[in-house]
């Protein structure tokens, strides 16, 4: 898998385009990306990288702000 979480990242782009870039209307797909990225880092280590995922430290902050846990779906 060359770009983990690419499907989720593309879903965000599609959602933002269809909602005139109102990110509040795309919260669910943004959450799905963060959950996917969390699983990616848990499975592959925090030194792994995907162009679709924020760095682990930023991801942890974003998940905390959104009250998400890695097991959410």
UniProtKB/Swiss-Prot annotation:
One of its GO terms (cellular component) is mitochondrial intermembrane space. A motif (Cx9C motif 1) lies at residues 5-15. Keywords: Disulfide bond, Mitochondrion, Repeat. Its main location: mitochondrion. It is found in: Mitochondrion intermembrane space. Residues 2-44 form the CHCH domain. A motif (Cx9C motif 2) lies at residues 26-36. Coiled coil: none annotated. It holds the Pfam family CMC4. The keyword Mitochondrion applies. Disulfide bonds join 5-36, 15-26. The twin Cx9C motifs are involved in the recognition by the mitochondrial MIA40-ERV1 disulfide relay system and the subsequent transfer of disulfide bonds by dithiol/disulfide exchange reactions to the newly imported protein. Belongs to the CMC4 family. This is Cx9C motif-containing protein 4, mitochondrial. It comes from Saccharomyces cerevisiae (strain ATCC 204508 / S288c). The gene is CMC4.
